[in-house]
């Protein structure tokens, strides 16, 4: 398959669509009641993971076209806003398999969601540029960050989201 065909392929277009839906939702998460927000996350995160696992490999010819767009300030604003909305549902415990640590460590769901957002928003904005080099970098970065960043974060967030949605109501 030609590089241009890969850059316009179904897996790339589907990833763009799901990533855009995720980023739109995270930007507006405060407009949703928590049960509705958790329900949406339970559906979109597996879709992101599936699309990421099917993502093509692209050889980057011109890495000078590579850019990151989401600033640290934007990241922090989004994380704090999401944490405030999640309230006492923001923190949970998990094990850190990357460091072979079987002891529970605290994790912030808002931080995981902001990390995922940052990688995906950067992918969307870089891919939107006109040049083939920018699109190559966007696709290569999305695959790389799936393997090292946002893909791992999805797998950390999903068990907690499942727990929150399946736990009996405290009022019962």
What is the role of each PLM region?
Residues 1-14:
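N-terminal leader/propeptide segments of preproteins
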Residues 1-4, 25-33, 96-106:
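Short, charged, low-complexity loops and linkers
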Residues 1-3, 101-107, 115, 119-172:
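Acidic, proline/glycine-rich low-complexity IDRs
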Residues 4, 25, 38-40, 55, ...:
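Phenylalanine-focused residue identity feature
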Residues 10-13, 73-76, 80, 111, ...:
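Generic alpha-helical secondary structure signal
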Residues 12-70:
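N-terminal interaction modules that seed assembly of large macromolecular complexes
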Residues 14-21, 40-47, 77, 81-84, ...:
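Charged, amphipathic alpha-helical oligomerization/scaffolding segments
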Residues 57-124:
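Long amphipathic alpha-helical segments
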């Amino acid at each position: 398959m030609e590089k241009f065909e890969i850059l316009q392929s179904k897996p790339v277009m589907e990833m763009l669509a799901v990533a855009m839906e995720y980023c739109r939702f995270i930007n507006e998460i405060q407009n949703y009641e928590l049960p509705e927000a958790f329900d949406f996350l339970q559906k979109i995160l597996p879709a992101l993971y599936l699309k990421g696992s099917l993502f093509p490999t692209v050889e980057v010819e011109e890495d000078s076209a590579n850019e990151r767009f989401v600033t640290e300030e934007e990241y922090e604003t989004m994380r704090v806003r999401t944490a405030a909305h999640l309230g006492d549902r923001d923190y949970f415990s998990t094990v850190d398999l990357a460091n072979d640590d079987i002891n529970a460590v605290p994790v912030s769901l808002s931080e995981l969601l902001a990390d995922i957002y940052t990688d995906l928003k950067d992918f969307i904005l870089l891919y939107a540029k006109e040049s083939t080099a920018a699109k190559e970098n966007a696709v290569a970065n999305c695959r790389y960050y799936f393997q090292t960043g946002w893909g791992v974060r999805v797998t950390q967030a999903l068990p907690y989201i499942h727990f929150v949605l399946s736990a009996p109501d405290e009022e019962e």
